[in-house]
Structures are given as structure tokens and as C-alpha cells.
């Protein structure tokens, strides 16, 4: 027998050794048991998850309610706590028990609580921050608040514990719970500063042309009292509380207000402040909100007027905010806005450095109480420019420093512009309006304004720029460079066509009122 056969015989005999076979089988069983244990663990975990989900699905629903107060909390001789609480469940007040797991000391008024099917408080939840919005009308001494809704209906509410120490002022907006019992949160206010254009103007009276008479009047009304207070005191003369600038649109009312703020600042040595707000921006559909914004504007003016700093409060489009009450022309919102404005205006007498200037295209629509002496004392009519004033205005925008037509100066071009604009012939006839048997021809001269003159000059400048771009710097005999008389007349033609289209597309009567015109019979 060879050596290879002997080794094979020994290996076979060893493989048939009972101990080795038993050890091998034990290893296999151990591996199977380990795998079964893992499978059993996974199955147990899955069973637990399924049971938890089943318990969740089978759990009764919880009802949300609002906590009012702890009604009773005591401990008997066995050490068992007995506690109950008063809650608001919808509009129903109920007294319900507290679960032993709920700490009564951690429940505050207005807080949300959860009730189980047996009407037991089993948990608390966050105080809701959504619900009906109300405006605070009055704060009572005991901490309660009088609030009003959009319709003006008033009610008394209490503070939830979450806002017990939060400062709440009149006019603040608050969120109340659905039952109308608790204030849950205070909303951030819409700041009047968001509506104000607050600036230090750099416009002076020298920048305004054609309004010498109006400038002289507003200097006397506003600038003298600010800069010569000692003389006014000696003569027992009070400064006017306000000035109303009225007249057709686009004729410099805002520029005059800015210029007076600039002049007052220069005279006082401090930076003057120009607070500008448009009347329609103050109108708000929520009751009391417009009045609150008016109060905030005057409060802001008072803050800025410290240390002799002059402040101009400029209210544009005043006729939209302070319309005549009781005429049926406006909604009843003016019945509260006008008195609030008058109250603030009457209080301006204690503010030596605050002046109110209003601007309006329709003085006939402003409430008479606003216009009476002692309120807006000075009324200045900013009229449409005549030919002399139009020449002065045009020269502010058309100067010799601009690239002009060779051989022409700014005076000659401005005079040509004004002559063309004030012609009363068919080429400048915008429309013939007829209302209730009265006919009138409306010409460009009837609606000319400072804004229109500037627009015409800008049109001519644009035409000159386009010509420069098209032809470059090459001079051509057939088309002179710069602002030419021909381009100015083309600009007037463009303005004429634009205004004629506007008249034809609008109601004639309304257009006349907006532009402060009347239909006087003139034989046209």
C-alpha cells in the first residue's frame, strides 16, 4: 500500500469521528438558533409597532377647549389629588376634572387644553395665535380691554396669560379666541412711517418759476412765524396752524411745500424734515385704523420737531381724505376721520415747529370745518401759468448750458415754445365740449401746467438725443444738432395729440372738474 492511500484512509477515519460530527452539528444548530432569535426579535418589534398603531387608531378623539381658571384643587386624607377647571368649550362654559398627569399650576387662562371622551383634561397645548381680529378701543383699570370689530361693534375681553404682561395700547390690533373672551396675541401695527416719505428737501424757491405771488404769500404765512417768533410774541400774533395749496394738478403745489421746508431748515440752522403722505393711503377699511394712522403721523412730527427742528407735514390729495361730511358724495368713513384730523390739527398749537400743509385739486370737496379760520388758516390758489409765468418755468428746464440749435439761445427757444403753446387756433384746439347747452372750445392754453411745460422740454431733449444716436457727431445741413425750434414744436404736437386723445376717451364733465375748468359760453 502506498503513502497516498494511507493519508486518504486516515482523513476518512477522522471525518467519521463521532466527536467531530457532533461538534459540526452543534455549530449548525447554534447558527440556526441565532437566526431564529433574530427573526423572533424582528417579529416581536413588528408586533409591537402594529399594536401601537392599533392602539392609536382605536384611541378616542380629543377635544380642544380654552382654559379659563382652576376651579378647585385639593388633596384628601389618602393623599389623592382632586382638581377641576373651568373651560370654554365653544361658547359653553363647563367645569371638568383634571387628569392626575396634568399639573394645575401650569395651566393659564386662555391656554389650550385637550379633553378626552369623558370630558377630562388630559393634556395642555399651545395657546392659539389665530382667530378674529379686533382693535383696542380702551384699556380698563383692571386689565380688561374694550375692543371693536370692523362693523364698530364693541365688547369687553380679558387678557390670556400669554399676554398678561404685554403692553397693549389703544388702537393696537389683537387676536381673540372664537368665543370672544380672551386676547390671545397682539399683532404688529402698520406703522405710519411705512406711508410717510420722510426727507430733508433740497428744493429752494429759486428752483420754482412762475409762482412769485404764491411764494410770497407762503413766505409770509409760514416762514415769518418760524424765523421771527420774538416779533410775533410782541404783537401777540399766532402763527397759522396750516396752509392749503389748491388748484389744478401739475402746477407746483408739492414743490412749494418742499421749498418752504428747505427754507425753514436753512433759517433755523437745523435740518428740516418734510413728511409727505398721500390722502388715499390713509384710508383703511378697518374701523379706527385711519384715525390711528393720523394720530401716528402727528406723533411722528412731534418726535422730529425737538430742539427747534422745523417739520412740515404735507398731505397731498387732501380732498380724498377729508371730504365734506353728510353730502352723500363720500362714504361714512369721513364722519370719524375728519374729527380726528381736526383734533390733531387743534393740538398743533402746542408744537411750535410743526406746520401742516395740504394740497388739493378740488377744494370744493373738502369739509368746511377743515377750511375755517383757526384750522387751515391760509389758502393759496396755485393757478395755471400765463404766458409770462410759462416763460419763467420753461427757462428753468431749457438753459443755455444745453446743446442748442446753432444761432439760437434758450430765451428765443423758450419764447417760441410759449407762443406755440398759447395759440388759440385750430391747430391747438383740443375739443369743443357741450354740456347742458353750454359750449366751449378747450385749447392747450387752457390746460397748460408746469408739469406739461417740463414734459414738452423733455420730449424735445429726447428727440435731440435720438438724432445724435442716429447720425453720430457728423453735422448735417438738413438736420441741425441739439435742441432745435423744430423739435420743440414737434414735442408740442406730441403733447397736443396725447391730451386730445385723453379728452375724447373720458367723460367731459369729469375731465373738466379734474382740470379745474368750467364751461362758460364763449361762442365756440
Swiss-Prot record:
One of its GO terms (biological process) is modification-dependent protein catabolic process. Residues 1-29 are annotated as: Disordered. Pfam families: AAA, Prot_ATP_ID_OB_C, Prot_ATP_ID_OB_N. GO terms for cellular component: proteasome complex. One of its GO terms (molecular function) is ATP hydrolysis activity. Residues 22-59 form a coiled coil. PROSITE patterns: AAA. Signal peptide: none annotated. InterPro entries: AAA+_ATPase, AAA_ATPase_domain, ATPase_AAA_core, ATPase_AAA_CS, NA-bd_OB-fold, P-loop_NTPase, Prot_ATP_ID_OB_2nd, Prot_ATP_ID_OB_N. ATP binds at residues 250-255. Keywords: ATP-binding, Coiled coil, Nucleotide-binding. SUPFAM superfamilies: P-loop containing nucleoside triphosphate hydrolases (SSF52540). HAMAP family: ARC_ATPase. PANTHER family: AAA-FAMILY ATPASE (PTHR23077), PROTEASOME-ASSOCIATED ATPASE (PTHR23077:SF144). Belongs to the AAA ATPase family. NCBIfam families: pup_AAA. Homohexamer. Assembles into a hexameric ring structure. This is AAA ATPase forming ring-shaped complexes. It comes from Bifidobacterium animalis subsp. lactis (strain BB-12).
Amino acid at each position: 500500500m502506498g503513502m497516498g492511500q494511507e493519508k486518504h484512509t486516515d482523513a476518512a477515519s477522522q471525518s467519521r469521528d463521532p466527536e467531530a460530527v457532533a461538534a459540526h452539528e452543534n455549530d449548525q444548530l447554534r447558527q440556526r438558533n441565532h437566526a431564529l432569535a433574530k427573526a423572533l426579535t424582528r417579529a416581536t418589534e413588528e408586533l409591537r409597532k402594529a399594536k401601537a398603531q392599533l392602539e392609536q387608531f382605536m384611541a378616542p378623539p380629543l377635544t380642544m377647549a380654552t382654559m379659563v381658571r382652576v376651579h378647585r384643587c385639593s388633596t384628601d386624607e389618602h393623599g389623592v389629588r382632586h382638581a377641576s377647571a373651568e373651560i370654554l368649550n365653544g361658547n359653553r362654559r363647563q367645569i371638568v376634572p383634571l387628569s392626575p398627569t396634568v399639573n394645575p399650576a401650569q395651566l393659564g387662562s386662555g391656554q389650550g387644553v385637550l379633553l378626552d371622551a369623558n370630558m377630562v383634561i388630559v393634556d395642555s397645548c399651545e395657546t392659539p395665535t389665530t382667530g378674529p381680529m379686533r382693535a383696542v378701543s380702551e384699556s380698563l383699570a383692571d386689565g380688561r380691554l374694550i375692543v371693536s370689530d370692523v362693523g364698530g361693534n364693541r365688547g369687553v375681553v380679558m387678557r390670556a396669560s400669554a399676554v398678561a404682561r404685554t403692553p397693549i395700547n389703544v388702537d393696537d390690533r389683537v387676536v381673540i379666541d372664537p368665543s370672544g373672551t380672551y386676547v390671545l396675541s397682539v399683532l404688529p401695527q402698520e406703522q405710519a412711517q411705512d406711508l410717510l416719505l420722510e426727507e430733508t428737501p433740497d428744493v429752494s424757491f429759486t428752483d420754482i418759476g412762475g409762482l412769485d405771488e404764491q411764494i410770497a404769500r407762503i413766505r409770509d404765512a409760514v416762514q415769518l412765524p418760524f424765523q421771527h417768533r420774538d416779533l410775533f410774541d410782541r404783537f401777540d400774533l399766532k402763527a397759522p396752524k396750516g396752509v392749503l395749496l389748491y388748484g389744478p394738478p401739475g402746477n407746483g403745489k408739492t414743490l412749494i411745500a418742499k421749498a418752504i421746508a428747505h427754507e425753514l431748515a436753512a433759517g433755523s440752522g437745523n435740518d428740516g424734515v418734510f413728511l409727505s403722505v398721500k390722502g388715499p393711503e390713509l384710508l383703511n377699511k378697518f374701523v379706527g385704523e385711519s384715525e390711528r394712522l393720523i394720530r401716528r403721523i402727528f406723533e411722528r412730527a412731534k418726535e422730529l420737531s425737538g430742539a427747534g427742528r422745523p417739520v412740515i407735514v404735507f398731505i397731498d390729495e387732501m380732498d380724498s381724505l377729508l371730504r365734506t361730511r353728510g353730502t352723500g358724495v363720500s362714504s361714512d368713513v369721513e364722519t370719524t376721520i375728519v374729527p380726528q384730523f381736526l383734533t390733531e390739527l387743534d393740538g398743533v398749537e402746542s408744537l411750535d415747529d410743526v406746520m401742516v400743509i395740504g394740497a388739493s385739486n378740488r377744494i370744493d370737496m373738502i369739509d368746511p370745518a377743515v377750511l375755517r379760520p383757526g384750522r387751515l388758516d391760509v389758502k393759496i390758489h396755485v393757478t395755471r401759468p400765463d404766458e409770462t409765468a410759462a416763460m419763467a418755468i420753461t427757462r428753468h428746464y431749457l438753459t443755455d448750458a444745453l446743446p442748442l440749435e446753432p444761432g439760437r439761445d434758450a430765451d428765443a427757444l423758450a419764447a417760441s415754445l410759449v407762443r406755440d403753446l398759447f395759440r388759440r387756433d385750430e391747430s391747438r384746439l383740443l375739443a369743443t365740449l357741450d354740456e347742458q347747452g353750454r359750449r366751449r372750445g378747450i385749447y392747450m392754453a387752457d390746460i397748460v401746467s408746469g408739469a406739461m411745460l417740463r414734459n414738452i422740454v423733455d420730449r424735445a431733449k429726447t428727440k435731440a438725443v435720438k438724432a445724435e444716436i442716429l447720425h453720430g457727431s457728423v453735422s448735417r445741413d438738413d438736420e441741425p444738432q441739439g435742441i432745435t425750434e423744430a423739435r420743440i414744436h414737434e414735442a408740442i404736437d406730441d403733447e397736443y395729440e396725447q391730451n386730445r386723445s385723453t379728452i375724447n376717451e373720458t367723460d367731459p364733465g369729469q375731465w373738466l372738474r379734474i382740470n379745474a375748468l368750467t364751461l362758460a359760453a364763449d361762442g365756440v
